[in-house]
A protein has these predicted regions:
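Cytoplasmic helix-loop-helix junction between adjacent transmembrane helices
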Residues: 110-148
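Conserved MFS/SLC helix-loop-helix module at the cytosolic interface between two early adjacent transmembrane helices
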Residues: 65-101
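Structural signature of the two symmetry-related core transmembrane helices
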Residues: 82-96, 289-305
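C-terminal membrane-cytosol helix-exit motif in multi-pass small-molecule transporters
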Residues: 160, 180-201, 397-401
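Helix-to-loop junctions at the C-terminal end of transmembrane segments
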Residues: 66-79, 163, 272-288
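Helix-loop boundary and gating motifs at the non-cytosolic
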Residues: 6-61, 222-266
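Transmembrane alpha-helix termini and helix-breaking/packing motifs in multi-pass membrane transporters
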Residues: 44, 154-173, 250, 368-387
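Juxtamembrane intracellular "pre-TM" segments in multi-pass secondary transporters
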Residues: 1-18, 192-232, 415-421
Length: 421
């Protein structure tokens, strides 16, 4: 109890920081309810064919990609809490609208609107936390991610119970629960204060040209290169959603029940270790330095996947478990690194627009990731070795471009920061 109380008391951002954690929990519970059954809802309740469901999901996902840069750009011009509240209301209305029709094109339109709101809200929540937590943003990200994962798990468990019932009414109640969660989040957001204007805490007070016209991230080649490299580093997500389940399904030795157990292991590890690991990337310099061990962990994960195909049932299970642990550690380290560097590389005057463009990395990975892991599976053990090695090399590449992007802050701030802390 004392440790739990201390953990909760020391959340950066004060009362608004606590409120945003409740928002993350409620949001992810709702998302967990719907994400687990969305395809089944469209199949069994709306009576769509497999091809129609696939097209609907693909189109809504493609439209959602625009949400991140659009939301970030708007947030640089309007009060952040108002934009966030409006987006949550939009998500709630989109979910309710799905309940009102079985028309294919209307379902596609409502799903696309919900996807757009979802991606925009994700980026703006990150921007809010960045402005609110200031120099403690990495720790806040870790706490927020821990709470969000717990929310996903709770939502998934509730959805599993409804799936056991398997009726159309059960699916509708889950969708309604998703809508209610967004409405509750909108209400909670109205109670949050507007955070101070974004200031990049890695730079000193002698920033150059702070009042210049905001830069466009689309003309910033260095930042776009960073975003492209981060897209590759997000591929660990595809390992758990597609790679491990398919690899296990096609293995002659791995027990098929291992896949969900490894997903549980991933979730438990993130909840248990994300906050402790965050302290290793609490500054921009430390986050950049983490790219070196992150490179090794990605390579280790790919190697473990490859070796899992060379032995019997025990060897396969052990190495697949080892691969899951390695990719989970990589996921946690990369979450810390990505949060800090994406903010540190963004100019103060256009922080929202830049973080919106960075949000494209995760969106793009959702399309590229499944293709990358299925290619690795098709190539066999060598494919997994190449998969891990490619991400490892990308980590080293990112380590270099970050150094070149922030030459002055990286050289001047550590001396000040070390002496002050």
């Amino acid at each position: 109890m004392p440790r739990t109380a201390a953990w909760w008391t020391h959340v950066p951002g004060g009362r608004d920081g606590h409120r945003m954690l409740w928002i993350a929990l409620v949001d992810r519970i709702g998302s967990g309810l719907w994400a687990s059954v969305s395809v089944l809802y469209f199949t069994y309740v709306s009576d769509l064919s497999v091809a129609h469901v696939g097209t609907l999901v693909a189109v809504s996902g493609a439209v959602g990609i625009a949400g991140a840069p659009l939301g970030g750009r708007i947030a640089d011009r309007l009060p952040l809490t108002r934009v966030l509240t409006a987006l949550q209301i939009l998500r709630a209305l989109a979910s309710v609208a799905l309940l009102t029709t079985d028309d294919y094109f209307l379902l596609m339109a409502f799903s696309a609107v919900g996807s757009l709101g979802d991606r925009a809200a994700n980026v703006l929540t990150k921007l809010y936390a960045t402005r609110l937590a200031g120099p403690d943003r990495v720790r806040y990200q870790a706490v927020n991610r821990t709470v969000a994962n717990a929310g996903w798990a709770l939502g998934g468990l509730a959805a599993a119970g409804a799936l056991a019932v398997g009726t159309a009414a059960a699916y509708r109640w889950l969708l309604l629960g998703d809508a209610v969660s967004f409405a509750a989040v909108a209400l909670l957001t109205t109670r949050c204060g507007e955070p101070p204007s974004a200031t990049r805490t890695v730079t000193s007070s002698k920033n150059t040209a702070p009042t210049e016209r905001p830069r466009s991230p689309w003309r910033d080649r260095a930042y776009l290169t960073y975003v492209a490299s981060d897209t590759v580093l997000f591929l660990d997500d595809a390992v758990f959603k597609v790679g491990l389940p398919l690899w296990i399904a096609h293995s002659d030795h791995a027990p098929h029940g291992l896949a969900p157990l490894l997903m549980v292991l991933n979730n438990v590890m993130v909840v248990a270790f994300q906050v402790p690991l965050a302290r290793f990337g609490a500054t921009t310099a430390a986050a950049r330095a983490l790219l070196i061990p992150l490179s090794a962990v990605f390579a280790l994960g790919g190697t473990a996947m490859a070796v899992s195909a060379t032995g019997g049932a025990v060897t396969t299970t052990l190495f697949l478990t080892g691969a899951a642990i390695a990719f989970t550690v990589a996921e946690m380290l990369h979450a810390t690194v990505s949060w800090e560097l994406s903010v540190a590389l963004a100019p103060d005057s256009a922080q929202g627009a830049y973080l919106g463009v960075h949000g494209l990395a995760q969106s793009a990975q959702r399309g590229i990731g499944p293709l990358a892991v299925t290619a690795a599976i098709a190539a066999g053990p060598l494919g997994w070795t190449a998969f891990g090695a490619t991400i490892a090399v990308t980590c080293l590449f990112q380590h270099r471009i970050v150094r070149e992007r922030l030459p002055r802050p990286a050289l001047s701030v550590p001396t000040v920061t070390v002496s002050e802390h």
